[in-house]
Amino acid sequence: MMFFGDRAVKYIVRKKSRTIILILIFIVVNILNITMLTISKNTNNMQSEIKQDTQSKIIIEKKNDYNISAKDIDFIKQNNEVININRISLQYAYPNNFNNFKGKIENNLREKMVTLYGYDDLSKDSRFAELEMKLVKGELINNKSKNAIIINQKLADSNSLDLGDKLVFRSTDKVIEGTICGIYESSIQDKQPETMTSFYRIENIIFVSQDISVILNNKEIYTKVVVYIADPEKIK
């Protein structure tokens, strides 16, 4: 053993430059291996974090005149991969104790209406999530909200409304009251043309909790449902 050790030492002394090159190659190879392992680990961690943060989702929308029913929702919930559902409804109603925001006036009954969007969670899958709209007062509608209403700042100003005030809506055969829990503004509301009629103006978009939508519609019907799932590959 000592013989081979002595020979190795003598070789290193005689071939210094070659030995240094071999050592450098060894170091570089090991650094590359460590780097690749680190990149692979970080990539896997990043993919896991992205999947957790974004929460894969499927969007189901009404087709033609067929709305999404409560029965459809129950069927969706039966899938074990479903972790959350955000139901979205749309209807139109007449203000009963306030006036809508006036745009270009047309001799049409719908020009006196407001647009109501019902949400389970307004912080997701909405114009608030896309940052087109932002809350300037109060709080957004969530799963626990009841009789909750969020209105536009200009609509509030034109009717001298504020947080806590009651609004009444009426449809063909229903009247429902709710409480203002939030006031919002839109980044594009001032870009609307002056010729835009009241019916289409952003100021007349009102967000409500789902219990208000159900009463106005006489039943649970939805125009869109966003289904959050744990693993898309396991959906059947």
Language-model regions, residue ranges each:
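N-terminal Sec/SRP start-transfer signal
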Residues: 1-34
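Charged, alpha-helix-enriched surfaces in structured cytosolic catalytic cores
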Residues: 3-4, 38, 175, 224
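Alpha-helical transmembrane segments
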Residues: 18-20, 28-56
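Conserved beta-strand edge residues that scaffold enzyme active sites
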Residues: 26, 90-91
